[in-house]
C-alpha cells in the first residue's frame, strides 16, 4: 500500500484526497501522474516523518517518469535536503547544483549550499586552517548573495553575516 494511503492525520488525509481529485480532473499524462504520486509520497509522508530512506526511494522513482525540468529541480532539491539532513554534505551539494541547472531561481538551494560552505568554513577554523576557512566562507558569501538576490526579503541572518564579515559589497 502506498504511503499516501496510510496517512494518519487529518491534514495529510485531506491533502491526499484533494491531490487525488485534482489528478483525476486536470488533464495530465500518465507519467506525470506517476511522478506526482511518488513525489507526494516522498514529501508529504516519508520525509516529514523522518523516513529518509523511503523518501529517497520515492524521489528516485519520481525522477524516472518526470521530464519537466522545473518539476525535476524540486525533486533534486528535496533529495539534496535529505542528504543534508543526514550530514552527507558533498552529496547534498551535488543535488543542489543539479537542481539549479534545471531551475536557477531556487533561492533555497543557494541558501543551503551557503549553509554547507559556512559549516565547512567553521570546521576549518576549528582545525586551525584559516586559509581553507576563508575559501569556504567566500563560497558561502557568493551563494548567500545569489539567494538574497532571488529573495531579497529572506535570509536576514545571512545578510547580517555578510555585513559583519565585510562581504556584502564584494
UniProtKB/Swiss-Prot annotation:
GO process annotations (BP): photosynthesis
Keywords: Chloroplast, Membrane, Photosynthesis, Plastid, Repeat, Thylakoid, TPR repeat
GO terms for cellular component: chloroplast thylakoid membrane
Taxonomic superkingdom: Eukaryota
Pfam families associated with the record: TPR_1 (PF00515)
Cellular location(s): Plastid, Chloroplast thylakoid membrane
Membrane topology qualifier: Peripheral membrane protein
Family, as annotated: Belongs to the Ycf3 family.
Stated role: Essential for the assembly of the photosystem I (PSI) complex. May act as a chaperone-like factor to guide the assembly of the PSI subunits.
Matching PANTHER family: CELLULOSE SYNTHASE OPERON PROTEIN C, TPR REPEAT-CONTAINING PROTEIN MJ0263
Annotated protein name in UniProt: Photosystem I assembly protein Ycf3
Gene: ycf3
